[in-house]
């Protein structure tokens, strides 16, 4: 009987630990879209809101249809709009990463195949947590 109770407790403990570990990298995305570039232009921008329940840094974003994808910020400095590359932007439980027109955004360089309105593209995001664990997630972005 004691052995049976011990097995039940071990099983419950395992379930609790699993839910903590698997819930730690919960990452949600909304409003994910890529702007359809004008004809002849091989660069465009992407936008989304990314939320998580833990502290993370964005290390990389990629897709085979683009030579390079970077995260950029935009801000007005002395009346001039400046765009700068963001290095390892952070997000957390109370601080989502908001990528929006005229603000932080994705810059997608070197379009290899023409984008079509309404098409879905999978962008691969690589995150790192506070313990340096790598988390790789694919998110769907619609071209519009």
Predicted regions and their residues:
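Pyridoxal 5′-phosphate
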Residues: 23
């Amino acid at each position: 009987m004691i052995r049976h109770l011990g097995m039940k407790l071990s099983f419950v403990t395992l379930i609790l630990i699993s839910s903590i570990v698997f819930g730690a990298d919960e990452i949600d995305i909304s409003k994910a879209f890529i702007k359809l570039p004008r004809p002849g232009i091989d660069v465009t921008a992407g936008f989304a809101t990314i939320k998580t329940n833990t502290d993370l840094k964005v290390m990389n974003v990629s897709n085979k249809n683009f030579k390079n994808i970077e995260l950029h910020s935009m801000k007005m400095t002395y009346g001039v709009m400046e765009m700068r590359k963001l290095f390892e932007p952070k997000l957390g439980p109370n601080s989502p990463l908001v990528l929006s027109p005229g603000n932080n955004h994705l810059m997608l360089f070197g379009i290899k195949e023409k984008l079509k309105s309404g098409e879905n593209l999978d962008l691969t995001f690589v995150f790192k947590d506070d313990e340096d664990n790598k988390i790789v997630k694919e998110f769907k972005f619609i071209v519009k």
